[in-house]
Amino acid sequence: MMQFSLHFFKKETRHVEYNLLRAFFEARDDFEVRIHDDRSAEFIYTHPRLLHQAVFYQTKSSQVPNIYRSDAAFLDINIHLEIPILSPDYFTKEVLLIAEQLANKFDFYIYYEIFEDPIEVDIDFIMTIYENLKKAYIDRHPQ
């Protein structure tokens, strides 16, 4: 199944306090934290009632498509979020609220492959993109 992927960037620095990042997720009961090593981890969100999942990844290398198109002031920090494209809109909005909290706490910007440059989190705008992508996916795969 297709994933809706958002990538996190910082402006003019790659510095991230990864111990604080991991603590952000560990403090939440709705996350399972899987640490692979000091440079990679998975933070798996499970909605308490719907049981749908989304995953925040910390990776060793960039997963951003067409990274060289964006403004050089924004630096990829190798953290991204994947939400299954057929997730309920309510669930997706809940995940985006967590992404917004994360971005605000760590001064992150977000990037989706159709953006020219990373942007500050705008949940309504991102939900519109998600809903349009989801509709297009369903139209192409009606079953």
Predicted regions and their residues:
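Acidic (Asp/Glu-rich) sequence patches and key acidic residues
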Residues: 1-143
